[in-house]
Amino acid sequence: MDENLTDTQAEETFRDIQGALNNMMTSSLQYFPPFISCVQNVCYNEGKLSLEAGKVTTISIGSLQQPIGIMLLEKQILRISEDPGERPTKRQRTSASPSRETTTTWIELSKLYKSIEDFDVLRGIFSSQIGTQAITRQALEAEGRGDYTKALKLYSQSSEGDALQVEVDLWDDSILECCKRLTLWDKMEESCLVDVDEKDGVVDLDQMWRDEYFKEHYLPFLLRSKTKQFCSGKHDDQFLNFISNSLKDEQQKAYLENKFSDILALLFILQDDYDRARYYTGSCLQTFLEDWSGLDSMMTSSRSAQLQSLQALTEMQEFLDFISNEGNFSTTSSTTSLLKRWSSREPDPKLHSVDIWDDVMTNRSVYLDKILLKFNKSSQLLNSEDSMDCSINTEQLENNFMKKRVMFSLRLAEVATGQVNFPVAKRQLQNSLHLIRDRLKNDRELEILWTHTYSDLNCKKCLILAPLEAIDTAISAIEQLDKVKDIKLLQEDLSTGVRHHLLKSSSLDTITNVLGINGTWDSLDSSLKEKLRALYFGKQADQLDKVISQIATKSFTTLQLAVKIAQSNENNLKTSDSRKKLVTSLMTMTNFCDRLLRLKEEDNEQTPKLDMKMFPGIVIRYVLKSMSYESTEARQKFPRLLQLVELHPGSDVEAFKRKSSDVPCWMFISWINQMVALLDKRESRAVHGILEDLAKHYPQALLYPLKISREQFKFGGSIEEQENKQFVERLNGTLSFPMLDDLIIALEQLTNPDMVFK
């Protein structure tokens, strides 16, 4: 181009191309990944072309092509900084604020990193001087920690002042994102409509179409919030009319169908229009397949994000297939099969955020309501025809569905607790408790499940609370657990009984840990001290060490109960859940004992005054037993057993030898070096059996560590030491690999070539 055109013509041509590219990005409805990636690659490779930073962010997030968008914006930032008109003088470099264009590009870049949840990079961006307010960095840090409540508060407090419009837009988007993570749908709706004008005293929703910014930023969240509230029973005719009118306009209809087919499908399900719902579900699945085919296999984060919506879509399709088949409503067997299928699959508790879980669980509740309504209609029809085949108990079915809804809610609370999203967990617990008490007449099984979820939430919350509040919260959890301790289900269901005692022990441990913080005991009032005394049924105690010791003793005995219950069915561990509960109880007891042993070894002042003679043996036996059940945590703890064998010789060595024989020898391969290092010690007989098995089954894994360590061994003249020496010689004799010996000699010569000539 430079050869055929003058400079002016070339500049005009580049300007036309750049305008055309920006126009293509602006007018795109589908954000087809290959097309978006192609345009961005052209701009990245051709230095004279650039796209608007805001448009790069929008299309990159919409097409899940964040990596190329990040590269493009970073290159544009470098280009701006290299512009002679942008570079400050030496005197200005330390004080001058960046230009408006630079700040805008940095903020748009931060949006891309935020969309892939790379908060480490975000922290780096906002820790430098990019022309933004300090409160933006503080709010983003809170988001990165998962503290969406604090982040929402900070974003809401931020004042526009001297902030650029792009930073204000970042605050608006972040407020909506925090509302989504906290499932605050009414707050989300309020934030979407705060700047929308009113018409005849009613919010003018049509402004969402007239204003391009509103359409891109507010419309997606408005649709989501209104639909979620519709699912919970809040009917809004104005919103439904808005959707109906929008679908009559060809451009608006195309926009909604391309981007929000899943929401449209759910809306029509809520209105019992299953044919239109089926159409939009099929459209959504087709769009998913097209987008998936356009994502490179190396873009793991984008593919993972794309997959997050698949379960909700699949279950929507299953529901529509189920509801359209009249044969499914003659008996409850098909419904039972559907519920089992749903119960067997769920989003990942760690990879999928709470709002994804909320989508799945809320949709399931809607489907159950619709299925129950269809059963009621079928039952009434059969009754009106005086049919003798009407054997469906709709009241019992409604009760079962209500139990499922409570279990969905409690599962969501568990996931939210695991993701440190405590406000969502608390709200789900409140909703489920209302259903248990009012609709299910205090169902005992669900009451225990609710109590365990509540106690788990309180234990996790204690980690971020002030000492006094943490103690009060832990005591509240223990009191709630004690309310259900006499229910028969705890004795009949081993898994439930184990979890009950583990949660109580965890709450007691929380109290002892908090009491160990300097100044906590002195700041407690008399009522709180009385509550602590009631935990272990002790007398009035004013000495901190006695209180800690008593509570630690109570925690230990509680763990013993958990282990006893878990081991009571050890010979019949058929399910993975029962094996998992056994390993969990064993490792919890192990960690408890090991923590106190370490405090004692360190001469810590806050070490509880307990008889710890049994603790080394408990750690050794329980770790090795957990290893026999293929516990990864136990395998990683094995070196600690070798240390305990050295520190506590005697009967513990015999326990080590006996229990280690039940563990597959391959599980010890990672720790061969540590075991070989013990061979000239008195306690080496503990690992003789393990090393013999390794020499028999995996000799090459043992060869190098033994060859290296053998030169450093020093054996004394005692009987035990001579026996150890004989064992080493016998072990070395079994590892006969002439070719490997020659290789080792050759490697030694390479390492010390001067030795060859001496």
Residue ranges: model-predicted function:
Residues 25-35, 43-47, 56, 62-63, ...:
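Conserved, structured core domains in eukaryotic proteins
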Residues 58-59, 111-112, 137-141, 174-178, ...:
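Residue-level signature for tetratricopeptide repeat
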Residues 122, 151, 188, 239, ...:
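Single-residue signature of alpha-solenoid repeat helices
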